[in-house]
Swiss-Prot record:
GO terms for biological process: chaperone cofactor-dependent protein refolding. This is Co-chaperonin GroES. SMART domains: Cpn10. PROSITE patterns: CHAPERONINS_CPN10 (PS00681). Heptamer of 7 subunits arranged in a ring. Interacts with the chaperonin GroEL. Signal peptide: none annotated. Together with the chaperonin GroEL, plays an essential role in assisting protein folding. The GroEL-GroES system forms a nano-cage that allows encapsulation of the non-native substrate proteins and provides a physical environment optimized to promote and accelerate protein folding. GroES binds to the apical surface of the GroEL ring, thereby capping the opening of the GroEL channel. One of its GO terms (molecular function) is ATP binding. InterPro entries: Chaperonin_GroES (IPR020818), Chaperonin_GroES_sf (IPR037124), Chaprnonin_Cpn10_CS (IPR018369), GroES-like_sf (IPR011032). Belongs to the GroES chaperonin family. The keyword Chaperone applies. It is found in: Cytoplasm. The lineage of its organism: Bacteria, Pseudomonadati, Pseudomonadota, Gammaproteobacteria, Alteromonadales.
Length: 96
């Protein structure tokens, strides 16, 4: 299934993160902290400014990003995999 985000929305596939406790025990499931890094798999056209111009999204497909995983981030299933739909404002950095 294809997905096309609207406006300044970005679709991100979260990178899995193996977490270990201070004692070296591997944490899984709800005990493990979710990664806030992922790969951009789709981007919207951009945000419409007050003057009517469209400001393109600053990230592109394939970018690895660090994002804010809080209020406003929507989780969906796409072809059996979990993806995140978030606003460009929720992206904090691009990993280079």
């Amino acid at each position: 299934m294809a997905i096309r985000p609207l406006n300044d929305r970005v679709i991100v596939k979260r990178h899995e993160q193996e977490s270990k406790s201070a004692g070296g025990i591997v944490l899984t499931g709800s005990a493990a902290e979710k990664s806030t890094r992922g790969e951009v798999i789709a981007v919207g056209n951009g945000r419409t400014l007050d003057n009517g111009e469209v400001k393109a999204v600053d990230v592109k497909i394939g970018d690895i990003v660090i994002f804010n995983d809080g209020y406003g981030v929507k989780t969906e299933k796409l072809d059996g995999e979990e993806v995140l739909i978030l606003s460009e404002n929720d992206i904090l950095a691009v990993v280079e």
